[in-house]
A protein has these predicted regions:
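Hydrophobic ligand-binding cavity/cleft-lining segments
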Residues: 1-72
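Short solvent-exposed loop/turn micro-motifs enriched in small/polar/acidic residues
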Residues: 2, 86-88, 114-116
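Amphipathic alpha-helical protein-protein interaction segments
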Residues: 4, 8-12, 44, 82, ...
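Hydrophobic residues positioned within well-ordered beta-strands of beta-sheet architectures
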Residues: 5-7, 53-55, 89-91, 104, ...
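Generic structural detector for well-ordered beta-strands
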Residues: 8-10, 94, 122
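Hydrophobic, Leu/Ile/Phe/Ala-enriched alpha-helical segments that form helix-helix packing faces
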Residues: 22-26, 93, 219, 223
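Glycine-rich portal/gate segments that line the openings of hydrophobic small-molecule binding cavities
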Residues: 40-106, 110
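Terminal "cap-and-tail" regions of soluble proteins that handle hydrophobic small molecules
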Residues: 102-246
Length: 246
């Protein structure tokens, strides 16, 4: 079962400022785990006035202990014993300054065999006020949605279909006597594919519910820096945030 997260809120800043802050949001005091950001493609359509940007983020993270315990070592790849790892995130965004909206979609390029995460943002200038006074230039509406889908359950079902119903959750995920302790195998063996998938998605949803408010706070920090010191203060803040170890 796929898990979803959604949130709506408003920034007390104009759309132009918010859309600029989006591209300057890493790193910030709430996102020092972002090791690097590279722009790999950018194009402007003169007919529509839309700017399309593709970026690649490298993020450091720590896999939840419950997930580390759940997965056989063959699935942990380069993750450390404490679950520390890093992954690339591909982000595509489109900005339409004339119409006053921006949309972005980010997805993980690593760990897809464990969990696929698709995060979508929409930033929008409020519609003209009913009284006909024009736009509220000091606010921007935001909608964020995150879709979490574990791939492990799909692989278990497919491999069981090929190998027969006698295959255990551990065996179809690549675990074995050399890959996981017997105690761990016994625990996984008692789980059905749906339970494994649901557990990973549920743990990830709980983590998303905690991280998204922090991401919102991080954007507010960047917005405040833009308001008080412009681009210079933002760049100085980014430099300081990079120097702080997570």
């Amino acid at each position: 079962m796929v898990k979803f997260y959604s949130s709506d809120y408003t920034y007390d800043y104009g759309f132009n400022t918010v859309s600029l802050a989006y591209f300057l949001r890493y790193p910030n005091p709430y996102a020092r785990h972002v090791a690097s950001t590279d722009t790999i493609e950018r194009s402007f359509d003169p007919e529509t006035g839309r700017l399309t940007t593709v970026r690649l983020h490298l993020k450091r993270s720590r896999m939840p202990p419950a997930v580390v315990k759940l997965l056989p070592s063959s699935y942990l790849g380069n993750a450390g014993a404490d679950g520390r790892t890093q992954s690339f995130i591909l982000e595509r965004s489109v900005v339409d300054v004339k119409e006053g909206w921006m949309e972005s979609e980010s997805r993980n390029l690593d760990w897809n065999n464990v969990l696929s995460v698709i995060e979508k943002h929409r930033y929008e200038r409020p519609k003209a006020l009913a009284e006909g006074t024009g736009y509220n230039e000091d606010s921007t509406k935001v909608n964020i949605s995150v879709t979490l889908k574990s791939r492990i359950g799909e692989q278990i079902r497919k491999r069981r279909a090929m190998w027969g119903e006698q295959a255990t959750a551990t065996s179809v995920m690549g675990g074995g006597e050399e890959d996981a302790p017997l105690k761990k195998q016994g625990w996984l063996s008692s789980w059905g594919s749906g339970a494994v998938r649901t557990a990973i998605e549920t743990i990830s949803l709980q983590r998303t519910e905690k991280s998204q408010p922090k991401a919102q706070k991080g954007m507010k920090v960047v917005l405040e820096r833009l308001r008080h010191g412009g681009l210079v203060e933002v760049l100085e803040g980014m430099r300081a945030d990079r120097e702080v170890e997570i």
